[in-house]
Amino acid sequence: MVYSYSEKKRIRKDFGKRPQVLDIPYLLSIQLDSFKKFTDQDPTGERGFEAAFRSVFPIKSFSGNSELQYVSYKLGEPVFDVKECQIRGVTYSAPLRVKLRMVLYDREAAPGTVKDIKEQEVYMGDIPMMTDNGTFVINGTERVIVSQLHRSPGVFFDHDRGKTHSSGKVLYNARIIPYRGSWLDFEFDPKDALFVRIDRRRKLAASIILRALDYSTQDILDLFFDRVNFKIKKDSLVMDLVAERLRGETASYDIKDSEGSILVEKGRRITARHIRQLEKTNTTELEVPVDYISGKISGQDYIDPDTGEVLVSANAEISLEDLAKLSLAGIKEISTLYINELDNGAYMSDTLRIDSTTNRLEALVEIYRMMRPGEPPTKDAAEALFQNLFFSEERYDLSKVGRMKFNRRLSIDDDEGTGILSKEDIVAVMKNIITIRNGNDEVDDIDHLGNRRIRSVGEMAENQFRVGLVRVERAVRERLSLGDLNELMPQDLINAKPISAAVKEFFGSSQLSQFMDQNNPLSEVTHKRRISALGPGGLTRERAGFEVRDVHPTHYGRLCPIETPEGPNIGLINSLASFARTNSYGFLETPYRKVIDGVVTDQVDYLSAIEEGRYVIAQAIVDLDADGRMMDELIACRHKGDSTFMGAGDIQYMDVSPQQIISVAASLIPFLEHDDANRALMGANMQRQAVPTLKADKPLVGTGIERTLAVDSGVVVAAKRGGYVDYVDASRIVVKVNESELTPGEAGIDIYNLTKYTRSNQNTCINQRPCCSMGDPVVRGDVLADGPSTDLGDLALGQNMRIAFMPWNGYNFEDSILISERVAMEDRFTTIHIQELSCIARDTKLGSEEITADIPNVGESALSKLDESGIVYIGAEVKGGDILVGKVTPKGETQLTPEEKLLRAIFGEKASDVKDSSLRVPNSVKGTIIDVQVFTRDGVEKDKRAVEIEEMHVGQAKKDLSEEFQILEEGVYGRARNLLLNAGFTEDQLATIPRSQLLVQTIDDEAKQTELEQLAEQHDELKADFDKKFEIKRRKITQGDDLAPGVLKIVKVYLAVKRTIQPGDKMAGRHGNKGVISKINPVEDMPYDENGNPIDIVLNPLGVPSRMNIGQVLEVHMGAAAKGIGDRITAMLEEQRELAELRGYIKEVYELGEEVQQRVDIDSFTDDEVLRLAKNLKGGVPTATPAFDGAKEKEIKEMLALAGLPTSGQRRLFDGRTGDEFERQVTVGYMYMLKLNHLVDDKMHARSTGSYSLVTQQPLGGKAQFGGQRFGEMEVWALEAYGAAYTLQEMLTVKSDDVNGRTHMYKNIVDGNHQMQPGMPESFNVLLKEIRSLGINIELDQD
């Protein structure tokens, strides 16, 4: 493998044995691709805005004299960029403008004669736009739209598993689910009649819908039944024989062949052997006794030719009397329905008997009554209702997917078709459910991923947009029918509000539009790759059963079987597997390598769950020879959802990677294959809660996916193009681009501005730091700057800590964690949290609130940190209770004398009395002010601080743009110099020419002269562009802010809090091994090894065996080896050993291991590169052991030996307090530990007095309300059990809701009198009132 300059800085030693056939696809593509499809112009009109507009337009007036047609649309540019939107608290959106054409037809002339056409571009609201990282900024906060897994449209056959009826009989049902429109259900009842439901309303006989489709009884019988024909003879009947139909029947007469010999005696069961004999004798007719027909069902109406009387009606049972009547009427042949209890039930025949309707109109009326109970049905209304239900494109749409699923399920060859149902479709579904009831077909598995599809952002936004358009359509149609259209333009007809409202509602408050989890880069990526079965049109927690939540065989390579929440959402919220993607229909696909005759090729095919069932697929861990041929005779593989063994020749596909089945979070866990799945689930979930530490530390034991994840998450800055680093400081990186990657006429400079100390959604700190130096060569994709939780471009969620597995004085009882004071001293787990505190000045009835430093009754010291505008300085250290923004609010007016009123009226003083309503630092918070922002309403005078901030921002913007312009200008002049040198100018000549004159020189060579003129033009464009950009930026900064009604001013203060680690904080490893810190121990008391190196963290060994997460032990051993090798490299550097020796040792490290795919050619590195690599390896050699393909025990031992450590992974330890050696050797090594966002500071809370609930007068609950602790029934039982009567009385009265008692108590405590007088608890009064409200009076006797 060829490494770039920046990749050579630190190379992760990879133990992967399998070749990487396919790189992990871009992790955010599910979000970005979906939204791109929504916003991109689509000429076919199948998706996005285009599809929505075409489905609603043209809108015709009721009279048909005018219509509004859609021409085209375009999305404008967002007014503010993403960062500005976040600061201002507005939505990052672009205006949608649609070109509409209004056509007026001439009433007097021939139909279709156009009288007038008007075209106009109409504004149709703002559409939130997706940022480059797949998020939306809505009202200043970053949100993610989670993809939804819902039941695919189409037809599904299922049964109730015998749960509906007490007998346990299995009742089958079929359901046609459209993309939008009414659901159509068919179901059997316990008596085997077929019923239909529309939109889950009351059921009707299924034949009613057929009658409504204009089928007669005769048509229905012809559709669903075969016939048995009889010829009527004098004393017997002759039946047309289809031998196969006799199978399973008991012969009620002797069956003879054509020669008269008996084949089946009367009373015997007819078997397959008898049928073969009948077929051999070519018997086509069979004589049967007359009573054989009794009870059979007539296949048609039989009418007396003379009188016209119906002798036997269709679907009626034929009796012997009926037969006599038929023969009297001269009818010689009769046909009955072929019905067989085994595989041809009389279901439709039974249904027709239940059906009371006889013709189409009656059926339509019956359907109308069911859909609109209480409304009188008319013929037209009933017709229209039924037509609109399933046969109108406006009301019903199966969608492309639905039609494909429908046709495939019913074995119709063509995947294409209309979005509405046809008569044939409904009949085909009914025939299929009868086939299933007859036992000739299987029901569907609704949890199969071929029957569930993904609905992503773009599709959901399109649906919501269409909802808004439909609302507008109604209004437009009414307006087209009213008034004089000659005066109106399209703009006058369209009101954009309903569209904006629908879109805003979806992005702002839909269940699937979620506040982005921004703890760390992993949590961001995972949130964007989340697949939820909940939400509108999906399941609900309460109704979802075990089957839906369970792992299904089709999840393989599509949804992760590990990563899902614990709790009520388990299995309903899933994560996309690493390589999965959605196909054009929205079904999940996963990649496989093609196998031909036992040889694996490099051809990769993506298969959906439906397609996968047809193939035999081997796992990725199959042994292959050098040519890719499978070596084993029998190979473990999957076929139709089952695991089995097959020969190499039968294999058709093979997995692309062992990590294919798991999500990115699970594939970050090293030695995952050694962990129990439950613990792996916790490990995957807890990594998302890791707080970014002050200084990120790459994991020594990783899995090789860390870099991919960090780059794809967008928190690091990756180079867009190659070149070299021209300039670096803390907030900007400038890259001079390679000539080969430039587009003609471009300056050739890429500028990357870094994000500094901004607040994330979870109040953690987002900060980017450059990790390149000036002059460094850069390749496209190289990491230039690290973000939160990344280290040299690798994801780094925690810290590598020195671990020992041993008990220590009970401080690691029940998973507690004992840590060394050194960890806290070195700030290993110190995190920065940024809080945003807002102060809002409103216009009240009594006058305006004012932000000022002039606050009544506040001492000088409390105002010491405020400036003259009453706003805190940046850099001030503040603690709980300090004033951040001084604000005064007018008080309610006291009763004024007439004289005072007169003075008020003259001098216009609104309110002389004001009260202090300043913004203060919350209790228990201590930190530093890092930023202040002031937003002032348009038309309100800006205070001094706001003007200062504005000037600072304008200055900063000018500085940034000037520097950018200078760099670009320098690039232009540089190219001009090179051009002039090539054209014959000397260096001395150029030195005398002023820089501004370089671009106006004259050259003899015409081509070069043209090029120089182009550069001059480019320079002028750059200058004009700079002026324009600066003016736009300045206008944006200085314009007034669009604040909510009644708000005059908002001041936002950003407070950075530094949190060191302390007892009560929650920590975890990556294997689900979590615990709370019990004690921070002095370094001198910690156990230490023979070299005197103390342990950082002591974990309980009892936490390993029962949890079955052995991966953590292997990680500790591998970590020890990785750190040991780093220590040896450090020693070599300190001893200044020969470079060849160092190079040899590093080479030995990277070449260790059997069949390892990674090849690092250390010999090709320059001496400087080797030294830089060695310096970066001093802290330990980072290793990668990919899931299911990681390091073997033997390789770990070899690594330990190479580090000069005991291969057992255990060492002697000594007690830090006594110096004595511990009894036995202890497992010591390095484990990657995370500090989770469950900090004791956020949870610790105590209350003396505070707010009370209005009705019960009990204290509120929770830290946010400054509430109390609930003293529940079990706690009451405990006090009762101990007989602590007075404590119990105190808890239930004065400490809770005895209003008078607690007031007295407070007085008594102040007076030093420690007694209490408990009274009546308020909740008892509430109970009395509740009972009285039921009409029962209770009065209490006073003693």
Swiss-Prot record:
The RNAP catalytic core consists of 2 alpha, 1 beta, 1 beta' and 1 omega subunit. When a sigma factor is associated with the core the holoenzyme is formed, which can initiate transcription. It catalyses: RNA(n) + a ribonucleoside 5'-triphosphate = RNA(n+1) + diphosphate. InterPro entries: DNA-dir_RNA_pol_bsu_external_1 (IPR019462), DNA-dir_RNA_pol_su2 (IPR015712), DNA-dir_RNAP_su2_dom (IPR007120), DNA-dir_RNAP_su2_hyb_sf (IPR037033), RNA_pol_bsu_bac (IPR010243), RNA_pol_bsu_CS (IPR007121), RNA_pol_bsu_protrusion (IPR007644), RNA_pol_Rpb2_2 (IPR007642). Belongs to the RNA polymerase beta chain family. Keywords: DNA-directed RNA polymerase, Nucleotidyltransferase, Transcription, Transferase. One of its GO terms (cellular component) is DNA-directed RNA polymerase complex. This is DNA-directed RNA polymerase subunit beta. The gene is rpoB. GO terms for molecular function: DNA binding; DNA-directed RNA polymerase activity; ribonucleoside binding. Gene3D superfamilies: 2.40.50.100, 2.40.50.150, 3.90.1100.10, 6.10.140.1670, DNA-directed RNA polymerase, subunit 2, domain 6, RNA polymerase alpha subunit dimerisation domain, RNA polymerase Rpb2, domain 2. One of its GO terms (biological process) is DNA-templated transcription. DNA-dependent RNA polymerase catalyzes the transcription of DNA into RNA using the four ribonucleoside triphosphates as substrates. Its EC number is 2.7.7.6. It comes from Shewanella sediminis (strain HAW-EB3). Signal peptide: none annotated. It holds the Pfam family RNA_pol_Rpb2_7.
